[in-house]
Amino acid sequence: MNSITVAELKAKQDNKEDFQLIDIREGYELDICQIGGEHLPMGEILENLDKISKEKEVIVHCRSGKRSAAVINALETQYGYTNLINLEGGILAYAEQIDTTLSLY
């Protein structure tokens, strides 16, 4: 499984690179903090496969990186995705290293 650090994600955002960012956390978690991208809750991923690009890099994140890793593993093994990247440490790492104004939970 491919992964990316929060510093690498921030550089991509700053450089306005073309990629898709997907947040798979639950709605109540987005109310606490978010870093942008599309919201596709983990439990709704399979019914929203058409919203996940197969052409460009797709960075998937959750709170800590565990749920996103599980989703990526399933999408790669069951649906043939090859362009998915897990955000190491999830939004917790982003809040600690990039934007300390984000609320932790």
Task: Name each region found by the language model.
Residues 61-62:
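Short, surface-exposed ligand- or partner-binding patches at beta-edge/loop junctions that are enriched
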Residues 1-20, 24-57, 66-105:
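Rhodanese-like catalytic fold shared by cysteine-dependent sulfurtransferases
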